[in-house]
From Swiss-Prot:
Known role: Binds directly to 23S rRNA. The L1 stalk is quite mobile in the ribosome, and is involved in E site tRNA release.
GO cellular component: cytosolic large ribosomal subunit
InterPro entries assigned to the protein according to its UniProt record, in alphabetical order: Ribosom_uL1_bac-type, Ribosomal_uL1, Ribosomal_uL1-like, Ribosomal_uL1/biogenesis, Ribosomal_uL1_3-a/b-sand, Ribosomal_uL1_CS
Source species: Actinobacillus pleuropneumoniae serotype 5b (strain L20)
Signal peptide boundaries: none
Listed PANTHER family: 54S RIBOSOMAL PROTEIN L1, MITOCHONDRIAL, LARGE RIBOSOMAL SUBUNIT PROTEIN UL1M
Similarity section: Belongs to the universal ribosomal protein uL1 family.
Designated name of the protein: Large ribosomal subunit protein uL1
Classification lineage: Bacteria, Pseudomonadati, Pseudomonadota, Gammaproteobacteria, Pasteurellales
Pfam families, A to Z: Ribosomal_L1
Length: 229
């Protein structure tokens, strides 16, 4: 078992793993230990009251955070004609059809999000083995297959996050950077939880959001008292 560094020992000593912290206190604890030489991301893990083995209980979607994530996504769009011009005007970094598909087949994937208009899926469908494992395959459930590609580009550029539960029923995503103001992080977390509650499967019974923990890239998880949100 790897030895803990002095920093990790200090973090673990400073975080009470048995306690659910009031949100402002939780953020203060995170910021106290966010001492890396780069600006750390603030990540969240949300334990859901679902059975991930059942397809009708899986949770997947997207939402735009009010204060963004602290980084600007590079967006590739599969579309043509007037939609291509609209996508470029909205800020898309790459726009094309077969030509863009060829770039991707060659391994040129300098983008974070892929969006497609419905008529372009005949081209995108050929890229499933490349885009799928990377979580980049366009999907109507998260708004990345849409006739309104310009709006989708604007959402991606303005801090939209996509979420999907893992095999343990946990959502992992980012809600900002460690240098965000506490209120910005709180607003983003509240927006995410509201989106998750809206996406609750009708077949899920009992408590839906069971536990919320936030952490920085190099830090320990801090449980959040949901009553403080």
């Amino acid at each position: 078992m790897a030895k803990l560094t002095k920093k990790m020992k200090a973090i673990k000593a400073g975080v009470d793993s048995t306690k659910a912290y009031e949100i402002n206190e939780a953020i203060a604890v995170l910021k106290q230990f966010a001492t890396a030489k780069f600006v750390e991301s603030v990540d969240v893990a949300v334990n859901l009251g679902i059975d991930p083995r059942k397809s009708d209980q899986n949770v997947r979607g997207a939402t735009v955070l009010p204060h963004g994530t602290g980084r600007t996504a590079r967006v590739a769009v599969f579309t043509q004609g007037a939609n291509a011009e609209a996508a470029k005007a909205a800020g898309a970094d790459l726009v094309g059809m077969e030509d863009l598909a060829e770039q991707i087949k060659k391994g040129e994937m300098n983008f974070d999000v892929v969006i497609a208009s419905p008529d372009a899926m005949r081209v995108v469908g050929q890229l499933g083995q490349v885009l799928g494992p990377r979580g980049l395959m366009p999907n109507p459930k998260v708004g990345t297959v849409t006739p309104n590609v310009a709006e989708a580009v604007k959402n991606a550029k303005s801090g939209q996050i996509r979420y999907r539960n893992d095999k343990n029923g946990i959502i992992h995503t980012t809600i900002g950077k460690a240098d965000f103001a506490p209120e910005q992080l709180k607003d983003n977390l509240v927006a995410l939880l509201a989106a998750l509650n809206k996406a609750k499967p009708t077949t899920a019974k009992g408590i839906f959001i069971k536990k919320v923990s936030i952490s920085t890239t190099m830090g320990a998880g801090v449980a959040v008292d949901q009553a403080s949100l």
